[in-house]
């Protein structure tokens, strides 16, 4: 028997209904903040990610699905979507459009990670990018947007972590300090950290090996090395978050796993997810567009929510989907009549299931479907224009006209 590939899975009902609710909430909140959807290809030229994400990141060195196309070009299934969105921004000259470009996306990404709870090799992200402003007001609004989505889907008990990783003016001094500190300490760390201590010391801070954490926690804080513009920017972001009533915790060694981040970085964690407890991450990337060939300065900030992990956090709290109406026709004439009724009720926005066969079986299925009502139709009901409608929760059964049934369904749905 052929099964789903390791690290992938089939999403089945009723779980898919929770996914749909989460996405509907996110789309509604994106609309409220004037974000518009963008859809990019699921594969891109490999150099987009090696240049954009960073050659020393785990994503590029270990996790990308890369293949050679028939023309010899190297292509990669997208491991994240910010680089793709910026590529589209440059290619289609979105800088020519008025104002900050606010774009969101929902879709699958691909990384060859070790499958574990909430982490898959094909996973889904809900993300957004605000491109065209360096203002700390935009940073705070993007973080507020994240918080609104999490609250909107019913997630509570999460923690917002923030930091500033400086810019090209102040970060080099910090990197040199890190390199000096790691000169004697790296030998006691994992192989990746030993290599990165020389090639990209900042990536050492992103190490997830538990045994290395005490060494990392003792390393200098980047906050102490921020230049005055970066420090002022970070203080403004914190102030705007406080104005909005958004609680946060500063994590001075949080750098996130992508090389393009600059200044503000943030992450949301949730205890229900265990050791790998991150729900989302994001940050500012003011130099990414230029690194991908843009002739126009295009500062931006964005985030991506791990939808698989978010759904896992809220799935148990979501109400079960309920079928509005189950129709039980008794006889051939009733089946024909019921099909028309079912179509009309569906056009009015109600979920309807028509069940042929014996009444006992229809009632059993209505219970299994979680139907609010069951409509029983026979020859007598058709002739009289009144139908037996049974409330499946109370057991009450009444005879109503078609319009009265429609009114009752409307009332139950509101």
Curated annotation (Swiss-Prot):
The gene is hisS. It comes from the Bacteria. Its EC number is 6.1.1.21. GO terms for cellular component: cytoplasm. CDD domains: HisRS-like_core (cd00773), HisRS_anticodon (cd00859). It catalyses: tRNA(His) + L-histidine + ATP = L-histidyl-tRNA(His) + AMP + diphosphate + H(+). Keywords: Aminoacyl-tRNA synthetase, ATP-binding, Cytoplasm, Ligase, Nucleotide-binding, Protein biosynthesis. One of its GO terms (molecular function) is histidine-tRNA ligase activity. InterPro entries: aa-tRNA-synth_II (IPR006195), aa-tRNA-synth_II/BPL/LPL (IPR045864), Anticodon-bd (IPR004154), Anticodon-bd_dom_sf (IPR036621), His-tRNA-ligase (IPR015807), HisRS-like_core (IPR041715), HisRS/HisZ (IPR004516), HisRS_anticodon (IPR033656). Homodimer. It holds the Pfam family HGTP_anticodon. SUPFAM superfamilies: Class II aaRS ABD-related, Class II aaRS and biotin synthetases. It is found in: Cytoplasm. This is Histidine--tRNA ligase. The keyword Cell membrane does not apply. One of its GO terms (biological process) is histidyl-tRNA aminoacylation. Its main location: cytoplasm.
């Amino acid at each position: 028997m052929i099964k789903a590939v390791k690290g992938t899975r089939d999403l089945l009902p009723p779980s898919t209904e929770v996914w749909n609710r989460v996405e509907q909430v996110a789309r509604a909140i994106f609309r409220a903040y004037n974000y518009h959807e963008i859809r990019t290809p699921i594969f891109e030229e490999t150099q987009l990610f090696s240049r954009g994400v960073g050659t020393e990141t785990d994503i590029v060195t270990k996790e990308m699905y890369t293949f050679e196309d028939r023309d010899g070009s190297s292509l990669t299934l997208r491991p994240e979507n910010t680089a793709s969105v910026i590529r589209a921004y440059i290619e289609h000259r979105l800088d020519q459009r008025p104002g900050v470009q606010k774009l969101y996306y929902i879709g699958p990404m691909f990384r060859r990670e070790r499958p574990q709870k909430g982490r898959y090799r094909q996973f889904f992200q809900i993300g957004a990018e605000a491109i065209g402003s360096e203002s700390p007001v935009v940073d705070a609004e993007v973080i507020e947007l994240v918080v609104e989505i999490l609250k909107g889907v019913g997630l509570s008990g999460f923690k917002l972590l923030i930091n500033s990783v400086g810019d090209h003016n102040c970060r080099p001094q910090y990197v040199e300090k890190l390199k000096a500190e790691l000169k004697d300490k790296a030998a006691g760390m994992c192989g990746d950290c030993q290599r990165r201590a020389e090639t990209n010391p900042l990536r050492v801070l992103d190490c997830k090996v538990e045994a290395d954490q005490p060494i990392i926690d003792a390393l200098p804080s980047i906050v102490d090395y921020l230049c005055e513009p970066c420090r002022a920017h970070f203080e403004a972001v914190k102030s705007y978050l406080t104005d909005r009533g958004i609680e946060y915790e500063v994590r001075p060694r949080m750098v996130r796993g992508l090389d393009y981040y600059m200044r503000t970085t943030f992450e949301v964690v949730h205890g229900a997810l265990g050791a790998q407890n991150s729900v989302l991450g994001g940050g500012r990337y003011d130099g990414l567009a230029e690194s991908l060939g843009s002739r126009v300065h295009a500062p931006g900030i964005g985030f991506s929510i791990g939808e698989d992990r978010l759904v896992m956090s809220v799935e148990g709290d979501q109400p079960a989907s309920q079928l509005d109406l189950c129709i039980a026709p008794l006889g051939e004439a009733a089946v024909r009549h019921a099909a028309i009724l079912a179509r009309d009720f569906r056009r009015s926005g109600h979920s309807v299931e028509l069940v042929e066969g014996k009444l006992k079986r229809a009632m059993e299925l209505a219970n299994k479907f979680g139907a609010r009502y069951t409509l029983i139709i026979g020859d007598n009901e058709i002739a009289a224009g009144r139908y037996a409608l049974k409330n499946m929760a109370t057991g009450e059964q009444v005879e109503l006209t078609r319009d009265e049934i429609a009114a009752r369904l409307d009332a139950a749905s509101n």
